[in-house]
Amino acid sequence: MMALLLEPLQFTFISHALLISLVVSIPCALLSVFLVLKGWALMGDAMSHAVFPGIVLAWILGLPLATGAFIAGVFCAVATGYLKDNSRIKQDTVMGIVFSGMFAAGLILYIAVKPDIHLDHILFGDMLGVTIGDIIQTMIIAGLVTLVISVKWRDFLLFSFDYQQAQVIGLHTRWLHYGLLCMVSLTIVATLKAVGIILSISLLIAPGAIAVLLTQRFHIALLLATGISVIVSMTGVWLSFFIDSAPAPTIVVLFAVVFIMTFTVISFNARTKGNAHRQDLLSPN
């Protein structure tokens, strides 16, 4: 039995996939709690799609793809904020227009220049094809994001929960706003090789959503989200070996299953406690 469980580790590509899934799962989990509490789930989705034209432009200009992706992600965030602040249109509407427009522009560029980057690898990642260089680059980005969150988490927490109070006590809310968006963009860049731009939104939302269902304490939510993200990501890679599937979609499906199971159990427990309390009220003394 143990030999069967350890069988995937005999292959270098599986070891690399497990390592990069571990690396990207930590910053994704930490950010996911802030995104869920702030109500920025759609912003993460928008930025993950918006990096596509940046990747193609970076290839055309001979720049690192990660650089183009990061710049495009930041541009999406800035453009969304500017349009929201200078029009009567709500933020979710602006995000829908900006990210769909940028994604479509990326597709037009991709078809026009026909780069030697496989479209599937951009959209869905190539976790089984990662190199040591990819892992090192991802570790640097993930380490930077994790460090910033570890140092400034209290400021980001107040910014996410009570924007007005953050302004009153003198926090630079604009810097916190764009700083958080820059970290989301960096994290999306880190996940590109692993899960691609389409599936990265799951890693940026699911861990925080599951953790918030389980606890109302912020620091515990951070720990739970990180643990859930690491376990689900690595389990997805390991499971994909035995079911002959791609690791990235397997990870996303596992996140969906865990979320549904958690929601079902929490709802059932709440309903059971409510019924028990009602019976206590109705029972004769």
What are these regions (language model features)?
Residues L4-H16, S87, Q91-R154:
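Transmembrane helix-bundle core of multi-pass membrane transporters
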Residues A17-I20, L65-A72, D92, G96, ...:
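Loop-to-transmembrane alpha-helix initiation sites
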Residues S245-N285:
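Cytosolic-side transmembrane-helix boundaries in multi-pass membrane proteins
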Residues V33-P115, A211-L223, S240-F242, S267-F268:
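Short loop segments and helix-boundary regions at transmembrane helix junctions
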Residues I198-P249:
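Transmembrane alpha-helical segments in multi-pass inner-membrane proteins
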Residues I135-P207:
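Helix-loop-helix "hairpin" substructures at the membrane interface of multi-pass membrane proteins
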Residues A50-I60, I97-L109, G129-V130, T173-M183, ...:
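Small-residue-rich segments of transmembrane alpha-helices in multi-pass membrane proteins
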Residues M1-I26, G274:
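Membrane-interfacial amphipathic/re-entrant helices at transmembrane-helix boundaries
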